[in-house]
């Protein structure tokens, strides 16, 4: 098996023209005719090669584009990579916003991802990033550093773990540095880079676990990964309930979904213990992630086309794992509980059936009308567990409904909840992290559709508003806790490679949830 590309990222103070590297990366806006000072200085040493490239129309600087200019011994860098930044965003003063203005941060993140992906394709061993210079110092350098680090990990990622054919010159390691000629600026960049490295590594970790197929990662395998994570970080502890222990507690939702598979379900709990004696006074945040390690639909079986992608139905649970990894590394001053109900949804003689009535961990009964609406069946037990642990804030994340993908496409996750402040905090975190969300309703009108005539609830509503009725079902299990639901169906996977990253799992949710927790800790 191949190892995932190992990225080493640091900051360095160095004059740009004296930076010895395979690839020096700078940014250019599409609607700014005059080159920034750094680019002008480089271009003067390159005999105007950059300006000629732009004037000839060979590089239009649109977002997601790039062009290579060779150093030819005129500068220390072997190559200069021009990365398109698209149209220039207004300055913070013009926008009336703080210096960490969010739009440009995602521009920088995407540009770094584009550059890292290009570096991997070109098999460049060393890369130096100076993307922040195009913004002229208008934005917070720490935030810029974090965005560049996150983008570097996102763009350099590729999943070829089980490809046995050798690839000539395949990169095993990519050395990246964020550079500036001013040591004070480098120090500010470094504060953000150090955080971005932690978050970027956590997202890559989540992408790899999610990409692994169901014969490699089943519920027990996911539990083993959680235990390994807890061994790696002293502030994490892990508890795993097997099917007998779940039965003793009455976790009927998870048990029903997993009943058809020989790979029995697991209920995984990761607890983060913060490094502060006053932690008992702080609220506890629960992250609840759906982990269906393979979803055939059960007896209500899915079409064969694209069923292989159903290994990705564990994305929500693994996003929680990745977030817990980042939280432990960052040592945030918060109480955080990661709850991951894990099961495999397969048809067999022992599967749960349409028409069955299931008693969940909360005591509420659910009429099963479709076994392919299984995510909510396991999440309701996870949410009830969080309530019984007296968690003040509960956020669940799941590839819950195809309806959400129909509504929002592959660009945004659906965001629902019962607390306006929490919703706004998650929207802010989405803007900060570049993982976009869109608010959707889940109120009483939708809850009415989930009532059953022969049980407390049924597990599907009508064909209309499926993302909203799915969230309304989950809402019945959160009690008085502040709750938010992220439906990430649609944003969980890249069907094909983009200008910014490889195809496969996106790792969506790790940056968003970690950013939310970082913002909460700072507030």
Which residues make up each language-model segment?
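A generic structural signal for tightly packed, nonpolar segments enriched in small/aliphatic residues
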Residues: 59-60, 126, 222-523
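Short amphipathic alpha-helical segment within the helicase RecA-like ATPase core
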Residues: 1-284, 288-291
